[in-house]
């Protein structure tokens, strides 16, 4: 049943998916930080985890915009940073984000993730005609 989608539809990014994050709210204060590059670790319909070398203090509620591209689809998400783990080299920190809104519905996001998983299942540099277009997603 699709009520439990979160348990079954989560894409661990075997590919390097670069994204940008902008902090838009700290506690009760509306802010707009500079965009910072991050690398997505996993994506689900209602959350993402990302890696960065930047420390973000989570003692206050932090809301951020995260944008990236997946299968030529621009994704823009807004959510609260809900967890922080220290992970070490080459990135220092892993953050979890609970998504509250975005340019896709949760169901549209799940469908895109399923499509992406099928699309990349057999992608290697040797067998893919799309390699040149997506080579920046490959873990080196």
What are these regions (language model features)?
Residues 1-43, 116-140:
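N-terminal helix initiation/capping motif
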Residues 13, 36, 62, 75-77, ...:
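Hydrophobic core residues within well-ordered beta-strands of beta-rich domains
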Residues 17-22, 60-74:
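Short conserved beta-strand and strand-loop elements enriched in small hydrophobics
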Residues 22, 91-112:
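Short solvent-exposed strand/turn elements
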Residues 22-24, 45, 84-90:
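Short, conserved beta-turn/loop elements at beta-strand boundaries and strand-helix junctions
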Residues 25-65, 96:
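Short strand-loop-strand
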Residues 60-63, 107-118:
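Extended Gly/Ser/Thr-rich low-complexity repeat segments
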Residues 77-84:
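Short beta-strand-centered aromatic/proline hotspots
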């Amino acid at each position: 049943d699709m009520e439990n989608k979160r348990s079954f539809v989560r894409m661990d990014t075997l590919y390097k998916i670069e994204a940008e994050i902008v902090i838009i709210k700290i506690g009760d204060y509306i802010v707009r930080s500079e965009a910072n590059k991050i690398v997505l670790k996993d994506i689900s319909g209602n959350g993402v985890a990302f890696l960065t070398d930047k420390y973000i203090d989570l003692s206050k509620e932090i809301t951020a915009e995260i944008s990236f591209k997946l299968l030529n689809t621009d994704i823009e998400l807004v959510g609260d940073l809900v967890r922080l783990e220290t992970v070490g080299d080459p990135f220092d920190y892993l953050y979890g984000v609970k998504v509250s809104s975005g340019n896709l519905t949760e169901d549209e996001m799940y469908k895109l993730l399923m499509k992406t998983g099928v699309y990349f299942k057999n992608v290697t540099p040797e067998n893919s005609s799309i390699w040149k277009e997506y080579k920046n997603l490959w873990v080196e």
